Amino acid sequence: PTRRVVSFLGDSTLFHAGLPGIVNSLFNNHNHTLIVMENGTTAMTGHQEVPSSGRNFNGPVERIPIRQVLEGLGVKRIWEVDTYRMDALRQAVEEALAEEGFKVVIAKHPCMLKFTRETRRKGKALPPAVEITDACTQLHVCVSEFGCPTYQLRPDGSVWVQEDLCIGDGSCKPTCPNGAIVSQRRPAGKEA
């Protein structure tokens, strides 16, 4: 069959609800690619730590590595890629989709929202925000394909950055084929 099934789980959801589905996929030999988004936090409920982060509410604890959990369940094909290495991530997903059976791509990068909040609390300079330069030719790749809510369209079709939504991680910069997205330094303490 040419049909491919792809699903996504965050690292927190993997631990609290995803493991039975993985066991089911393995047991039934599903042709299924799972992408685990490992950012080290439970963002949807307030940035609590997850078992793979090495911390709990009391402080440091022994990590429970996602890869080891998956291997323990019997997953044979696992790719681990830094989410910000977009070419490598794309390659890993394409390789996984080309194979039969159940396989997992672990897309890893710390949560930048949590990072910027911690940085701000410490009074350090925040990561740079981004701005759109005159090199923008309104291809709108940053809006339509990258999908960051920071990017907004004006009625005339030009793109602007809603700075209070920008976390400054720079992951968007390679998406513009014209190089119109550039960094802009922010002072310490300014809201990310």
PLM features per residue range, with description:
Residues 115-116, 137-162, 167, 171-189:
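Iron-sulfur cluster-binding cysteine motifs and their immediate structural context
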Residues 1-106, 112-119:
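Thiamine diphosphate
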Residues 55-58, 127-138, 163-167:
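Short, contiguous acidic/charged loop-to-helix segments that flank catalytic cores in large enzymes
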Residues 27-28, 55, 125, 181, ...:
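Alpha-helix boundary/interfacial micro-motifs
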Residues 4-5, 31, 77-78, 174, ...:
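N-terminal export/assembly segments and adjacent metallocofactor-ligating motifs
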Residues 95-150:
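Glycine/aspartate-rich loop-and-adjacent alpha/beta segment that forms the canonical ThDP
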Residues 46, 130-132, 186:
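A broadly tuned "polar low-complexity/structure-edge" signature
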